[in-house]
């Protein structure tokens, strides 16, 4: 069972979005996933949501066109409307400074972007499943 029921996933890779959603639905079929292809699309989706329908958590891929994960994180944490939404950034970057900077900007966590189905499952179980 998920501790977060409504999730926004911003990732420009359609295959990664599909894998994430498939695994999430296996774990909790009632979970709602809203997908965005980049940070700008995520902002547009959030802006259309009523306050009582905002997501419980936002997961951001760092390497997106138009608005990166870090740029999206800065926007979210500077916005009074969105600053309290839990946010995770994932990235293929393996640079400690990047991880630390995102944490200082307000990310709940920063993780290596999953590269296998099992790695996606482990990430979802670590961050989204109620223990």
Predicted features along the sequence, with ranges:
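Receiver (REC) domain active-site loop signature in two-component systems and cognate sites
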Residues: 64
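Active-site residues of response regulator receiver
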Residues: 11, 60-61
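Active-site beta3 strand of CheY-like receiver
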Residues: 52-60
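Alpha4 helix (beta4-alpha4-beta5 surface) of REC/receiver domains from two-component response regulators
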Residues: 71, 94-111
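Short amphipathic alpha-helix used as the core "switch/output" element in two-component signaling
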Residues: 44, 70-83
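Two-component/phosphorelay signaling modules centered on CheY-like receiver
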Residues: 14-38, 105
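Helix N-cap/capping motif at the beta->alpha junctions
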Residues: 35-47, 69
């Amino acid at each position: 069972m998920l501790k977060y029921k409504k999730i926004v996933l911003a990732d420009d890779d359609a295959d990664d979005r599909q894998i994430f959603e498939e695994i999430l639905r296996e774990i909790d079929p009632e979970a709602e996933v809203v997908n965005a292809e980049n940070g700008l699309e995520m902002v547009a989706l959030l802006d259309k949501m009523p306050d009582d329908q905002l997501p419980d958590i936002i997961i951001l891929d760092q390497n997106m066109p138009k608005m990166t994960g870090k740029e999206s994180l800065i926007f979210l944490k500077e916005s009074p409307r969105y600053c309290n939404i839990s946010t995770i950034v994932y990235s293929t970057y393996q640079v400690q400074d990047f991880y630390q900077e995102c944490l200082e900007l307000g990310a709940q966590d920063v993780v290596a972007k999953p590269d296998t189905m099992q790695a996606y499952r482990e990430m979802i179980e670590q961050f989204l499943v109620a223990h």
